[in-house]
Amino acid sequence: MPPKKAPAAPQASKKTEQKKKEKIIEDKTFGLKNKKGAKQQKFIKNVTHQVKSGQQNPRLVAQAEGDKKNKKDDKMKELQELNDLFKPVVVAQKVSKGADPKSVVCAFFKQGQCTKGDKCKFSHDLSLERKCEKRSVYVDGRDDELEKDTMENWDEKKLEEVVNKKHGEAEKIKAKTQIVCKFFLEAIENNKYGWFWVCPGGGDTCMYRHALPPGFVLKKEKVKEDKDEDISLEDLIEKERAALGPNVTRITLESFLQWKKRKRADRILKLEEEMEKRKEDFKSGKSLGVSGREVFEFRPELINDDDEEADDASYTFELEDSEAEEIDDVQDIDLSRYVLKDVDETGITVASCERFSSYVASTEKDENKLCVASGGVMENENQSEEEQEGDLENGFVDAVPVDENLFTGEDMDELEEELYTLDLEK
């Protein structure tokens, strides 16, 4: 590995260096400051200069300072020459007696050389010069205003005024026609019409009208009207309800059914009238708009005529057993048969609260299934003790005798599991 660099010695501060230089100057000029000789004073000056300038030759130092000063002077002269060449000469302004200096534009401000700012007695508004200057016969001041006056800032009245001014005289000379030029309408609709618009169809010699048709509405005006008329459904309903007034018929089920029945009858009557009208039109030879189904409804004899005019060749088509389908009579559903009515509660059964007790009785019967399956007597709470004793005296026993030694212990366990899992039907 390369040897590590020795740490840089800390640099002495400027004050420390200055003290060292003063110490050196005092040592070299010790005892000479109080002497008045020219040689001693010159020697002290040279020593002081050498120490402060870093032991440099005083001639070289003086020469470097002279060169630096000369370069600075040369730059100043060069800038002065450039300013004299390219900067226009500004003559001091004179204002006539009694005139307002603020009505005159500052000449230095026009050249970008005014350094007075707000303290300048002349005006710094460049528009004053254009307002006060004489009107030129070669420039029309209205051109700038017309260029800024575009169709975006016009309303419907302004548009009519511009059209009348621009095309009014030309429209009087043209042949009378009511057709509006399509280029004119496209320019207005696309917001391209203005003072300097020229018709692509021939300018002023276009044979069509360059005037707004009656009832014309601009797009932006139309959008505003649509926005104003656009109201919500809730507001519309409330508005219509308020317009009905207080003296109106209240809606009930009976009135609603009567209204619906009347509407259905009116609709059926209207359909019949339309069908009769179509039939009369068909008879008179006006078959336009008549469907094929209506043709056969109006003239059913056409069905038989079509069968007679058919080819003599007959085609048979038999379905296989797998493809054969049973065809049942199908009837169309007529929605007019269904009428809304109040629900009649007569004859409607309601579940009683006793259904819970019957459910408990059925569960008790299920518990007796185990006794019956094991050959025991079914428990009967309604049977009295006297009847049970009478059965024993007569020798009738309902239970089947079982030999307990017939089964071993394991067989009994399996039998008990089967009996518990066994579920018999009633």
From Swiss-Prot:
Chain coiled-coil ranges: 62-87, 257-283
Keyword Magnesium found: no
Residue ranges of the region described as Required for interaction with DRG1: 237-261
Swiss-Prot/TrEMBL GO biological process terms: cytoplasmic translation
Zinc finger (C3H1-type): 100-127, 175-213
Pfam families on file: DFRP_C, zf-CCCH
SMART domains documented for this protein: ZnF_C3H1 (SM00356)
InterPro entries listed in its UniProt record: ZC3H15/TMA46_C (IPR032378), Znf_CCCH (IPR000571), Znf_CCCH_sf (IPR036855)
Domain of life (superkingdom): Eukaryota
Ranges of biased composition (kind: Basic and acidic residues): 14-27, 65-74
Residue spans of biased composition, Low complexity class: 1-13
Ranges where the record places region Disordered: 1-27, 51-74
Subcellular location(s) of the protein: Cytoplasm; Nucleus
Family to which this protein belongs: Belongs to the ZC3H15/TMA46 family.
Quaternary organization: Interacts with drg1.
Protein name (record): Zinc finger CCCH domain-containing protein 15
Organism the protein comes from: Xenopus laevis
